[in-house]
Regions:
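N-terminal Rossmann NAD(P)H-binding glycine-rich loop of SDR-like oxidoreductase domains
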Residues: 3-23
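Rossmann-fold scaffold of SDR-type NAD(P)-dependent oxidoreductases
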Residues: 6, 57-63, 105, 206
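Adenosine-cofactor binding site in Rossmann-like domains, unifying the SAM/SAH pocket
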Residues: 28-48
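Conserved cofactor-binding/catalytic machinery of classical short-chain dehydrogenase/reductase
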Residues: 42, 84-91, 102, 124-125, ...
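NAD(P)H-binding glycine-rich loop region in Rossmannoid oxidoreductase-like domains
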Residues: 44-84
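Conserved Rossmann-fold NAD(P)-dependent oxidoreductase catalytic core, especially the SDR/UDP-sugar
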Residues: 61, 87-120, 135
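NAD(P)-dependent short-chain dehydrogenase/reductase
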Residues: 115-119, 123, 127-178, 183-192, ...
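C-terminal substrate-binding subdomain of Rossmann-fold SDR/epimerase-dehydratase oxidoreductases
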Residues: 165-274
């Protein structure tokens, strides 16, 4: 099958493209880091995007300007951040309206958290998707090897990099809880959509580990894997999610279940970063 992956060079997109290629699929990738001609927020690229979409069987819409909690804490209220994401969604959904290709929109478990613009924007993307009869998945803190500027790294990558220097300085008290999932498991979940296994377009497909873990426990897991590391607690509370704990839908378990433990996933990242 020929698949277009939008956001093909991101933390999820890059390993997904490699995984689907290994499974025999033909992958076309679009990412603004490849070329300004692949910047989805630029309306001058819509014609080329439509032509590319016309040549494929399915579209995976991962592209979004995003980063970890420290990035969101700074950028979430910026005009440029909001504007870029609105434009890239508008242009992409316009192309999907014309091509009518089956597509999967990558949303977030934060889509109901409208105190953040990120959550609101993902909710907006879901509304676009529903209007076009597309599929929706929601990511819950997917982690893996990241190739981005330090400001955008997510918490696990951030902690591993700090642990290499012998000290994990946390921004928060570590009491906030998250559900983490390694990109290997995420790849298999998305592959089940590519293979047309999902059976109800009205469902939200939560791609998560279904296990809560406190951030301090993430730091301690990294410490256990990497040797003597000093952990310094911060003073901030959960500024991004404000302690909200959504309950993931387990509908996706009919087609996919996560396999890697948090420790196993972190070990994979540690080995790559070293």
């Amino acid at each position: 099958m020929k698949i277009l992956v939008l956001g093909s060079e991101g933390q999820i997109g890059r390993p997904l493209c490699a995984h689907l290629t290994s499974r025999g699929h033909q992958i076309l990738g679009w990412d603004k880091t490849n070329s300004i001609k692949e910047d989805l927020s630029d309306s001058r690229n819509i014609k080329s995007l439509i032509e590319t979409m016309e040549s494929v069987d399915r579209v995976v819409f991962l592209a979004f300007e995003v980063g970890g909690s420290k990035y969101l804490a700074r950028a979430d209220k910026d005009f440029a951040y909001i504007d870029e994401n609105v434009k890239l969604m508008s242009n992409t959904f316009k192309a999907l309206t014309i091509t009518r290709k089956p597509f999967l929109f990558a949303s977030s478990q934060m889509a109901n958290m409208h105190h953040t613009n990120y959550g609101f924007l993902k909710d907006l993307g879901e509304r676009y998707t529903k209007s076009l009869g597309g599929w929706i998945c929601r990511f819950w803190n997917v982690f893996g090897v990241e190739e981005c500027e330090d400001e955008k790294t997510h918490v696990i990558t951030d902690f591993i990099i700090k642990a290499k220097e012998g000290k994990i300085e946390m921004r928060t008290t570590g009491e906030e809880a998250r559900q983490f999932l390694h990109t290997d498991d995420c790849n298999r979940a998305l592959e089940s959509w590519v293979n047309d296994e999902w059976d109800d377009i009205g469902q939200y497909y939560d791609i998560t580990s279904f296990e809560w873990v406190n951030i301090i426990d993430v730091a301690n897991t990294i410490k256990d894997l990497m040797g003597p590391v000093q952990i310094i607690l911060g003073e901030s509370t959960d500024e991004v999610q404000r302690g909200i704990r959504n309950i993931p839908s387990e509908y996706i378990k009919r087609f996919w279940v996560p396999q890697l433990s948090l420790s196993e996933g972190i070990q994979k990242v540690v080995e790559k970063i070293k």
